[in-house]
A protein has these predicted regions:
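Gly/Ala-rich beta-loop-alpha elbow adjacent to hydrolase catalytic centers
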Residues: 1-4, 8
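C-terminal catalytic histidine-bearing segment of alpha/beta-hydrolase fold enzymes
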Residues: 44-45, 91-133
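Short beta-strand/loop motif that positions the catalytic acidic residue
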Residues: 65, 72-74
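Residue-level signal for short, function-critical loop segments
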Residues: 2, 76, 112
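Active-site signature of alpha/beta-hydrolase-fold catalytic machinery across serine-
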Residues: 10-14
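Alpha/beta-hydrolase-fold catalytic nucleophile elbow
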Residues: 24-25, 73, 111
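Acidic catalytic loop of the alpha/beta-hydrolase fold
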Residues: 76-87, 115-116
């Protein structure tokens, strides 16, 4: 969730021991988009990985390891993960999961709302882990 969500995303990317991730309001989307259009002071140093964009954006890394299961809970008005950045992420990552033959391994919930944790988010996360672990 939140800071833990982005931490779980980056750990999911780099550590093969992490079989699946489900960041809730975790700041996943596009670092490039957020840097250009978002409120940069919203995220602390934990979010800005030095030099990351010289290698790729969050979607590039997720697409590269498809079909490793990933679920995002991305409220459409979450200041920490603008909808436009999430949309860019989905547009790049979804085809990678389809090409890998496991489109069900990538699940995105873009519910109306702000940065908050709801029972619906937890229920979606539990169902995702039950199915993928």
């Amino acid at each position: 969730m939140s800071f833990g969500g982005i931490t779980s995303f980056y750990m999911w990317v780099i550590d093969d021991r992490i079989a699946a991730a489900a960041p809730l309001c975790g700041g996943v989307g596009s670092v490039d988009y957020f840097g250009r259009k978002g409120r940069m002071s919203y995220h602390g140093t934990y979010w800005w990985v030095p030099g990351m964009l010289t290698k790729g954006d969050q979607a590039d890394f997720a697409a590269a390891i498809a079909p490793k299961p990933l679920m995002l809970w991305a409220p459409t008005e979450d200041i920490g993960m603008p909808k436009e950045g999430v949309d860019q992420f989905v547009a790049k990552v979804r085809p990678a999961y389809q090409q890998a033959g496991k489109p069900s391994g990538f699940v995105v919930h873009q519910q109306p709302g702000k940065h908050s944790f709801t029972m619906a988010a937890f229920e979606a996360m539990f169902a995702f882990f039950d199915k993928n672990l």
